[in-house]
Design a protein with these regions (language model features):
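Short, surface-exposed loop or secondary-structure junction motifs
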Residues: 83, 92-94, 148-357, 361-362
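Sec/Tat signal peptide C-region and signal peptidase I cleavage site
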Residues: 35-39
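Residue-level signal for well-ordered, solvent-exposed loop/turn and beta-edge residues enriched
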Residues: 2, 83-84, 129, 260, ...
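Bacterial N-terminal signal peptides that target proteins for export
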Residues: 6-24
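Short, conserved catalytic-motif segment at the N-terminal edge
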Residues: 47-109, 129-131, 138, 146, ...
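Bacterial N-terminal signal peptides
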Residues: 24-34
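Catalytic loop of the DD-peptidase/beta-lactamase superfamily, centered on the K-T-G motif
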Residues: 40-84, 231, 270-708
């Protein structure tokens, strides 16, 4: 689950409690001890079980997701002892309801793809072709980075998120109906220009790039494409007939329909072209078939030794908060190897979730009981799918008599105020994490407030100091503590229990922010950044089929905050044209860091990070408001941006498109009102003070005509 989803989930649930409604939670989700009585793990005869409780429960909760929590459609399956005992689907597929959902409807599974990559690496470990603890450069001599510590990175570090890579290099990877391999093919070139965020192995922080590098490692060692490898060794032996990648021939009519609040119709097919990181397509039934590798039901694919190695507490190899109930505790590939609430019953559960812009998935496996559940969806979020998957398994465990009764939901209780030591006040200040900046105030009475500088409209959160040295929220759902780690940095440790009406409860425990150190800038550097404050920069190097054009992430505002001088968001300004993200936070709060650079070219300023290039607003010229004009994509391949002057407002623009090009139009609020790849429309009324982007291959010409 992405960190922003966790943060929004916490805030939304609290707001919902205050309002006594699930509406606040719905808004967020549409964005995003030993047990009392437990039998010893052993195979059971399931012939007399009906799974009626599980079936009834999943139908009710799946209906709730599609009716109240923003999920368009979802599909689910439960496997027990090698038999798929529960499966189904609900929701809307196509707009006209002409194509029904079935158990064979194919969905993207996002980062759950990482488990297939991890299994691929471990198979090569079984064969003696890869050693988890031998540097990657031994297998790939052409793998280089700007930061020379890259030579320490091992395959294990790629799979447990501890390699220290910056995060996600996904330029032109997420496309509509386009399986272009550019992001994969140029990935090593991108890494060659990057630094590391930390010493390899220092701590585990979620990294898509680690798995993309591991994908290429598999290809180099085997001489096969990743797609060919997983089909030969996993999907074919397991009869996962509906599991594909963007490099396969996929019948788009078999794919679940995807939608966006920004467009009224059904969107084109989504291709996530860094495959091992998040690009595999599958069904819930196929995913639970795949889970049999991890329950031992299927032999000859992975050794027991490799399966057990994947389930070890890899997160404990580096910096991490003390163990507590959580949904995040990395193994090899797995998001958690000790998933709550199963841990409360003394049951080992491992899980992996995934989210793309359109699709979401959750796979939960109980290795000791030969059981697994998978839930995948169009719309929604992986965390809500995890609720359903967990409920499927808990209901089945009840019916089997393994769980005698459900445990009550957990809470830290209403805080009882205690006298706060004076030295605690020193922890007040500005904290960075989750791609956001937070201000923490602590008064002498032991009251702490947490407010967002990044999103000032968010409500201020209040906490009370208690006798165990922690601050607890008024509703008892979250406990915060300041921790000074061995590296000298101060972290805000958050433990929380989040209950979502009608769905269940999840737990989180992580460092969610790091205290930012003061950064006083010389006058000339401060002046250079002050000129950028409030400006907008426009994406110019995304392919014309990119999904980013619709989602308005193609327009980037620069916003500095007077309360956080010397920083751009949580990036420390290191020069007139550079800002580095120096945060070192394990888990998810420190993921996807980026070093930002500015440069002058063609009479304008460009901003670059993570492979993306943005042009300053000075380079956006008014579109010609006469009857006819044209624009051509130049040799650099950069998209051409234009503004809508008052003389063109309200006019009808018709664009004659080249074979390999598209355009998008945005209103004055930066909302996309037409992306030609999505709508198929080349005629649009120009909005007041809007923006237009033309993108395509080098030499592509767009012929433009305007009329009243």
């Amino acid at each position: 689950m992405k960190p922003r989803e966790v943060t929004k989930l916490k805030m939304s649930v609290r707001t919902a409690r205050k309002r006594n409604t699930i509406v606040a939670v719905t808004l967020m989700l549409t964005i995003l001890a030993p047990m009392s009585a437990m039998a010893a793990p052993a195979p059971m005869n399931n012939s007399n079980l009906t799974y009626e409780t599980a079936k009834k429960t999943v139908i009710e909760k799946a209906k709730l997701l599609t009716e109240a929590y923003g999920t368009t459609s979802l599909q689910y399956a439960l496997i027990d002892g090698g038999e798929i005992t529960v499966s189904g689907q609900t929701g809307k597929n196509d707009l006209n309801d002409k194509v029904p959902l079935t158990t064979n409807t194919i969905y993207g599974i996002g980062s759950t793809s990482k488990m297939m990559l991890t299994a691929a690496v471990m198979k090569l470990v079984d064969e003696g072709k890869i050693d988890l603890d031998v540097p990657v450069v031994n297998y790939m001599p052409d793998f280089t980075m700007k930061d020379k510590r890259y030579k320490q990175i091992t395959p294990r570090m790629l799979l447990n998120h501890s390699a220290g890579l910056l995060g996600t290099s996904s330029g032109s990877a997420i496309l509509y109906g386009d399986n272009d391999t550019y992001a994969h093919d140029t990935f090593l070139d991108q890494l060659a220009t990057q630094n590391l965020m930390a010493e390899p192995g220092a701590y585990s922080v979620y990294s898509n790039d680690g798995f993309t590098l591991a994908e290429i490692l598999v290809e180099r060692v085997t001489g096969m494409s990743f797609t060919a490898f997983i089909h030969k060794y996993f999907t074919e032996p397991l009869k996962m007939n509906h599991t594909k990648t963007p490099q396969d021939i996929v019948n788009t009519g078999e794919m679940a329909g995807i939608y966006s609040p920004l467009y009224k119709g059904q969107l084109p097919h989504e291709n996530y072209n860094i495959i091992a990181s998040g690009g595999i397509y599958s069904t819930a039934k196929d995913l639970v078939k795949f889970s049999q590798i991890f329950t031992g039901e299927v032999k000859g694919i992975l050794s027991n030794k490799s399966v057990e190695a994947m389930e070890q507490k890899e997160y404990r190899r580096g910096m991490w908060p003390e163990d507590s109930d959580s949904s995040m505790s990395y193994g090899l590939g797995w998001d958690s190897v000790d998933l709550f609430p199963f841990s409360a019953y003394g049951i080992k559960a491992v899980t992996k979730g995934g989210d793309t812009l359109s699709y979401h998935s959750s796979l939960v496996v109980l290795p000791e009981y030969n059981m697994a559940a998978a839930v995948i969806s169009s719309g929604g979020a992986s965390i809500t799918n995890q609720f359903i998957a967990s409920e499927l398994l808990l209901s089945a465990l009840e019916e089997k008599g393994i769980i005698k009764e459900r445990k009550p939901e957990k809470s830290f209780g209403v805080p009882v105020k205690a006298d706060m030591p004076k030295e605690i006040s020193k922890f007040a200040g500005i904290y960075g994490g989750n791609n956001s900046v937070t201000k923490i105030k602590i008064n002498k009475a032991g009251q702490m407030t947490v407010s967002s500088l990044t999103a000032p409209s968010n409500p201020v959160q209040e906490y009370t100091y208690t006798s165990d040295g922690t601050f607890v929220s008024d509703d008892g759902t979250e406990k915060l503590k300041f921790v000074v780690e061995k590296n000298g940095n101060t972290y805000l440790w958050s433990r929380s229990y989040i209950s979502v009406p009608g769905l269940g409860q999840v737990a989180f425990s992580e460092y969610n922010a790091e205290k930012l150190k003061a950064n006083t800038l010389p006058k000339e550097i401060n002046a250079a950044w002050a000129k950028r404050d409030g400006k907008k920069y426009y994406l110019v190097n995304a392919k014309y089929t990119s999904m980013l054009y619709l989602n308005a992430t193609s327009i980037l505002p620069i916003q500095l905050n007077k309360e956080n001088p010397g920083y751009m968001s949580n990036n420390k300004i290191t020069g007139a044209n550079a800002a580095a993200n120096l945060l070192q936070i394990p888990g998810t709060a420190g993921r996807d860091t980026m070093d930002i650079h500015f440069s002058k070219k063609n009479g304008g300023e460009y901003l670059t990070f993570s492979g993306y290039v943005f042009a300053s607003e000075e380079m956006v010229k008014p579109i010609y408001s006469g009857k006819r004009s044209a624009t051509i994509i130049q040799a650099d391949g950069y998209a051409k941006w234009f503004s809508v002057p008052a003389t063109a407002k309200g006019k009808v623009m018709t664009v004659k498109l080249p074979a390999n090009g598209a355009f998008a139009i945005y209103d004055q609020n930066g909302i996309c009102i037409n992306h030609s790849v999505v709508s198929g429309k080349n005629v649009v009324v120009l909005p007041e003070n809007g923006r237009i982007v033309f993108a395509g291959e080098v030499g592509s010409q767009f012929e433009i005509s305007l009329k009243k």
